Amino acid sequence: MALPISLINELKSTVGDQWVIIEEKAVERYLYDETAYGVRPQPVRDIVVVKPGSTEEVSEVLKLANKYKAKVYIRGGGTGLVGGAIPTKPGIVLSLERMDKVHVDSENMVAEAEAGATLGKLIEEAEKHNLMFPAHPGDEGAFIGGLIACNAGGSRAVKTGVMRNYVLGLEVVLPTGEVLKLGAKTIKNNFGYNLAHLFVGSEGVLGVVTKAYLRLYPKWSYTATIVVPFDSRVKAFKTAKKLLFSGLIPLALEYFDRRVIEASAKHLGLQWPIMEGDYFLMVILAEALEDVLFLELEYVDKAAREEGSLEPFATQRTDEQKTLLKIRSEIFTALKKDTFDILDTTVPLGSVDKFIEAVMDIERKHGVWLPVYGHVGDGNIHIHVLNYQGYTREQLIGVSEEIYEAALKLGGVITGEHGIGYIRRKYVRRLLGDVWVETMRKLKGILDPNKVLNPDKVIPEE
């Protein structure tokens, strides 16, 4: 163990003996996240796991880390896809799992959630008060702190935005141990610089989010899901554009093809219920008034048919909607074992069709399958580069970079919701420039003078 025994003893005095884990097998589960194996960094095993139970304990742990110049890696639910939680140097894994309280202030439609609370728990607690947290950025086992740190998005970002849009206030422990309390329960707050949003999307390099005030909404009374099949991608994208520019704002607008969605259904032991078509749009609608929902359903059906769709499948039944969404949501899991890397490219709305056609050109060039699906409603498209037989690691990275270039040529970016983490850091200087890098280094230097917090992430090496 590279960490001094005196540090370990002081950590035990701070959080309690049972919350400091040094046994190798127990530490193992804290060394990885969901990053695809082909691009995942190799973790170090010289790690101690510390589980604080309060903001005050987080503060004391960080003060000790500075005293001993020990590296600290923040651990949420382990659902990240870019290696952001993987320890790459000896140090402390700071797991926030004990800090999982959620309090709903129903009168003000605000949730006060600790960083270790899961997305699923937040949704469940809100529903007890006939309220909802509309965002659904993927895995419900993800921790609130991690979702904020990564500014997570997901399929429902079309109607209600990404995590940043919900954050009213934060409690943050700076790398040196000082505690910042930012924002309030109010919708509007123009008192001083909005430092809270400096930490949203900061990926754990500037501070540790320990608590958040999150905006909730009245629960939508009526929902419907309509899956529209097409015999060509062109017709699907024409319909998507038509819907987006009509003024209709769906809760979600998703694209996928038959091969991808049937792989997910098979993985779940289910059957995809739509027999026609090879390309699909899935439109999820949610409204307070049933009459409005019916008008929207009619419009989606009409607009799709005008663009040459096949027979749409619409349902208001809760069980059927959940099944459709479950199959869509498990695409990543179904493909995971064969995946070298999952890309998170995002392009302007009007260029989604051009981008996917460019990806299909790359697929044909290499004679491989590039599974494509995603949030067509906000331009965020996921592509899996698989472990193709006969391809070296360098060749697989080359395929990924061809896809990145296709997105960049259309004015897009290489990540829309997963973040930079460890695995995308090598592209930062080229894509964001020297001034961005130097500005971030200066900011990091002010907040984290001893460079203890989440090293090897986001900011390129000097």
Where are these regions (language model features)?
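N-terminal accessory segments
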Residues: M1-G38, K67-A70, A303-E320, K409-I414, ...
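N-terminal flexible segment immediately upstream of the FAD-binding catalytic core
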Residues: M1-K63, G80-M109, V260-L270, T318-I342, ...
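C-terminal substrate-recognition/cap domain of FAD-linked oxidoreductases
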Residues: I22-D33, P218, P229, F237-E402, ...
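Short, ordered loop/turn segments at secondary-structure junctions
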Residues: G76-T79, M99, G138, Y255-R258, ...
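FAD-binding subdomain of flavoenzyme oxidoreductases
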Residues: K101-D105, M109-E254, L453
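Activity-critical C-terminal alpha-helical subdomain
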Residues: E178, R425-E462
